[in-house]
Regions:
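Glycine-/Pro-rich loop/turn segments that contact NAD(P) or position catalytic residues
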Residues: 1-3
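Internal alpha-helical scaffold of NAD(P)-dependent oxidoreductase catalytic cores
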Residues: 10-58, 62-97
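NAD(P)-dependent Rossmann-like dehydrogenase/reductase catalytic/cofactor-binding core
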Residues: 53, 57-64, 68, 89-99, ...
Length: 205
């Protein structure tokens, strides 16, 4: 999180650049004593990780907000990582990219901490059992919460774009799709776990 970097706490991140020479030079120049950058020339996978982890963080927050437990969150994060890798590969990236800082690392951070705007919104949605529109309408009536209601939550916009990507690349992303259904009020939160758990059996991957 940016606040921790500003305070000099240790951190690491991926720097995506197709030009390896330029990427290595930029990583070396931009790294700080307490913050290390690792060059990654696989730009597609880094981009997919950066976008989709926000959607999975929303889902993780909803899971905890609704009281579904730590086991459910761990399963969701793990299967969410699989969806990230699946989409990256379909778009021409590499699955292994998502095992690094821009995938697993960023996902663990964003999907478990209340410093994350996406996770915080998920918690609120899970506790309220409402769609995004319903929660926003209720929140902005409280002047003390109006500022937080206007926060930019990247996962909301990303979730809305995923249906098109799934169709274009022929990829199934059941968790990400469920988040969009929840945000738009197409399905109640109480029904989502049952919907996901009753999907046709398949091998892990």
């Amino acid at each position: 999180f940016a606040a921790e970097v500003v305070h000099g706490l240790p951190a690491a991140a991926a720097l995506a650049c197709a030009d390896a020479t330029l990427g290595m030079a930029a990583g070396e120049r931009l790294s700080l004593p307490s913050s290390r950058l690792y060059h990654n020339s696989e730009v597609v996978g880094v981009q997919v990780g950066g976008a989709l982890k926000n959607v999975i963080a929303l889902a993780a927050g909803m899971t905890m907000g609704h009281g579904l437990g730590e086991n459910a969150r761990a399963a969701l994060i793990t299967r969410g990582l699989a969806e990230m890798a699946r989409l990256a590969e379909a778009m021409g990236g590499q699955r292994t990219t998502l095992m690094g800082l821009s995938g697993l690392g960023d996902l663990l951070l964003t999907a478990t901490s209340e410093q994350s705007r996406n996770y915080r919104l998920g918690l609120k949605l899970g506790r309220a059992g409402q769609s995004l529109a319903e929660l926003t309408a209720a929140t902005v009536t409280d002047v003390s919460n109006a500022a937080s209601a206007q926060e930019t939550v990247e996962g909301v916009g990303s979730a809305a774009l995923l249906a098109d990507l799934c169709q274009r690349y022929g990829v199934e992303l059941p968790l990400a799709g469920a988040v969009q259904q929840l945000l738009t009020g197409q399905i109640p939160l109480a029904a989502v776990a049952q919907q996901l758990l009753t999907r046709p059996y398949r091998a892990e991957g």
